[in-house]
From Swiss-Prot:
Cysteines paired by S-S bonds: none
GO BP annotations listed: phosphate ion transmembrane transport
Protein name: Phosphate import ATP-binding protein PstB 1
Subcellular localization: Cell membrane
MF (Gene Ontology): ATP binding; ATP hydrolysis activity; ATPase-coupled phosphate ion transmembrane transporter activity
Record-linked NCBIfam families: 3a0107s01c2 (TIGR00972)
Organism encoding this protein: Streptococcus pyogenes serotype M4 (strain MGAS10750)
Residues involved in ATP binding: 39-46
Its membrane topology: Peripheral membrane protein
Domain of life: Bacteria
Residues in ABC transporter domain copies: 7-248
Catalysed reactions, as listed in the record: phosphate(out) + ATP + H2O = ADP + 2 phosphate(in) + H(+)
Any Pfam family the entry gives: ABC_tran
Family listed: Belongs to the ABC transporter superfamily. Phosphate importer (TC 3.A.1.7) family.
Gene this protein is translated from: pstB1
Amino acid sequence: MMTEPILQIRDLSVYYNQKKTLKDVSLDLYPNEITALIGPSGSGKSTLLRSINRMNDLNPEVTITGSIVYNGHNIYSPRTDTVDLRKEIGMVFQQPNPFPMSIYENVVYGLRLKGIRDKSILDHAVESSLKGASIWNEVKDRLHDSAVGLSGGQQQRVCIARVLATSPRIILLDEPTSALDPISAGKIEETLLLLKKDYTLAIVTRSMQQASRLSDRTGFFLEGDLLECGPTKAMFMNPKRKETEDYISGKFG
């Protein structure tokens, strides 16, 4: 029996200043899977990711057509509360971006915005989220130190914990390891594989090795088109399109 997708993208196009940068993309995200989005720079991967939790709304020059259905309704309908949407569909960016405050306050930031003040609830959220991001043991004795003083890899895992604290169902990651050293990147990858048990993840990556190690499905983008999408193993072993094969084998990028 086929698993139902948790999110369905249909005929999504994104225009910047009337220029079509994402072209009629249709893609499903499935529960407890990691979907990798690959392709050269400027191919539309990050644009798609930012469309899934309406981050592109912050740019007045962007126009979007098509639909993204989550929880039974189109997230681009006027009745969507984007604040609530971004709690359920969290985002982790390329550069670690902890707030200039303590590790503890970074993690509870979203909960405080919701008006939660109960210390026991906040304490539990901090511990469970930092454990989920595989960094609790490294920071549990210095929760009130500045998050900015952590290493880049630790900062990125605190950013993941900050997303986890709002109890999302989907986590979007835009090249989350590209600014990190190989050891830190490896820890992030291990964390993502653990998170897959409880969440749905979509990751933009420029590393074919990372895509093959982490993802269940892969979508290949070229010049705004989703040229090919399917199970990662099948795509990497036997791509249907020559462009996909050329990109995966490093003939262009």
